[in-house]
Curated annotation (Swiss-Prot):
This is Homoserine kinase. Its EC number is 2.7.1.39. It comes from the Bacteria. Keywords: Amino-acid biosynthesis, ATP-binding, Kinase, Nucleotide-binding, Threonine biosynthesis, Transferase.
Amino acid sequence: MAVYTEVSDDELEDFAAEYDIGQVVSCKGIAEGVENTNYLLQTDQGNYILTLYEKRVNPEELPFFLGLMEHLAAHGLACPTPIHGRDGKALRTLCGRPAAIVSFLKGMWSRRITLGHCAELGPAMATMHLAGADFPLTRANNLSVAGWRPLFESIRPRAAEIKSDLAQSIEDELDYLEAHWPRTLPVGLIHADLFPDNVFFLADKAAGVDRMSGFIDFYFACTDVLAYDIAICLNAWCFEEDGAFNATKARLMLNGYRRVRPLSADELDALPLLARGAAMRFLLTRSYDWLHTPPGAMVKRKDPMEYYRKLRFHQGVTGPGQYGIE
């Protein structure tokens, strides 16, 4: 989440008046994330999230995202749900951009990922995959293997600003991924951006542990290889700050997932390749954002080199056992 578009008090009041959510008390920008403009909206009836859709979000795909959140919530997955206005619409326009208000999900994301967090993540991700099985809409993953080379070409001229030989490294890896990408693995609804800041936890004080309270930010959700979601999480959840891979975290996440949705031998064997692809996807998008984020935007740029180093790790993985598979 981020803030690219400032909303005036008058514009906000007029927009909120379309909903039965009470009187606006405050509206505070949320700086985390990189895709859309987000505000924490407080009214005299409660808290909400106001989102203005920017950049890579195609307005024609917004009914997919909003409908998906409603579908998953109806199937028992904890996630925000769109608030419908008095006219029944969940999507309207604010400051010239598509905009929506969604419910506020209690909890916080953890800045320090523990073994317990990974153990909670696995079964919840599998539950989401199963819940999405009968969602009637589909959406292609525009940031999967077919989209990586065009994205690379858009950063190639300036890639050396990040690392002198980055362009050649990416080109070599893309050649490999395009030649070997799996085409026959189980496909379904995936989140595709299940980073720690999109997973909320609440403290269970009695048990002395954190319990997952839900998933947020479904605006990259799509129809793709289910195990690719797992590969994204191997990258996002299982590396330590010093860059070391934590196989115990990976094992707990994978074991929890497999208890809810067993993985086939083909899916397990494909994990190293899928993890390389996931690292490439975020290396490319982070590189693009690093080079193209507007000056003065209220957004935190994320270091693309983190994913270059993760890619290098996965290139050295020879089998799923190195991810803690038992």
